From Swiss-Prot:
It is a multi-pass membrane protein. Keywords: Cell membrane, Membrane, Transmembrane, Transmembrane helix. It is found in: Cell membrane. The chain crosses the membrane at residues 14-34, 68-88. It holds the Pfam family FtsK_4TM. GO terms for cellular component: plasma membrane. This is Uncharacterized protein HI_1595. It comes from the Bacteria. InterPro entries: FtsK_4TM.
Amino acid sequence: MIKQITERFTPRQYLAEFLLGLTALFGLYLIVAWSSYTPLDNSWATVSAYGNTINKVGSFGAWIIDLFFVFLGYVAHIIPFTAFLVPIYLLKTKAVKQLSCTRIILR
């Protein structure tokens, strides 16, 4: 039984699952930053007279979300949810076994 379990998971698959988990956590961080975004924060493109950061995740969250909004426009609203939901989907469907570096680069 133990031999069957160890044959299924390789170190590369463990690393892939770990990185997907970190990506999902970063996506959750971006969702919180996106939901508490306000133009009154001191961020990448704006300077505010209000000294405190209103964003719930701090000045870095305000900065990164504002950077997304400036460079990507309305598409920036999709990025936090995609960064959270795609890794969760890949982990739930066990698609990690089929992932390879060349597939990720080509997609």
